[in-house]
């Protein structure tokens, strides 16, 4: 047993976000950032994973290594992709168009609910700067354009952290009981 889950974490509950997606994106950000800082002396700004990559719920109760393999059965590794602020806007437009609760951390998208147009984007509570490079933690699958995330594939700035996303979940659950 790695940890205890006080409530079921499920990707099907939520329109723009899900509790399991938020958890996985936050874990990826939290555990990937020190590795990126040590290797490249840079900081992850945003983490974006994909809704379809979450393959099971984390049920209320004991969380085991098997749970981690059921939730994340793929051998996805953490890739950090450098995107301009303009490309971040494209990323936000993709999320809105998809209408799926893709796991996201470090970014807020404010939209007009009637038109679904973007009013404002914040990265770590700061307004988006279209000329800046932002470092986005994601999976190797998405970095290569999976799920039609072509904004990642087109980037020339990529860092392979050689760190399995599932292993991050296991490590985090070993450290924190709930």
Language-model region placement:
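A conserved active-site cap/scaffold subdomain adjacent to cofactor or substrate pockets
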Residues: 13, 18-24
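Short intrinsically disordered, low-complexity coil segments enriched in acidic
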Residues: 1-4, 175-177
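Acidic/histidine-rich, surface-exposed loop or edge segments in extracytoplasmic proteins
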Residues: 2-15, 70, 149-153
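Feature captures C-terminal
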Residues: 22-178
């Amino acid at each position: 047993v790695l940890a205890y889950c006080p409530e079921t974490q499920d990707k099907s509950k939520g329109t723009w976000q899900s509790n399991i997606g938020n958890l996985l994106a936050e874990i990826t950000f939290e555990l990937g950032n020190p590795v990126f800082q040590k290797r490249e002396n840079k900081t992850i700004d945003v983490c974006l994973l994909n809704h379809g990559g979450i393959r099971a719920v984390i049920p209320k109760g004991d969380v085991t290594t098997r749970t981690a393999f059921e939730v994340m059965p793929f051998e996805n590794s953490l890739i950090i992709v450098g995107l301009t602020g303009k490309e971040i806007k494209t990323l936000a437009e993709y999320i809105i168009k998809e209408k799926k609760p893709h796991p996201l951390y470090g970014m807020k998208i404010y939209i007009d609910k009637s038109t679904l147009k973007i009013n404002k984007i914040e990265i770590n509570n700061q307004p988006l700067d279209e000329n800046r490079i932002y470092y986005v933690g994601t999976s190797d699958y998405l970095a290569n354009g999976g799920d039609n995330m072509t904004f990642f594939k087109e980037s020339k700035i990529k860092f392979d952290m050689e760190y399995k996303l599932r292993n991050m979940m296991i490590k985090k659950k070993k450290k924190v009981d709930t």
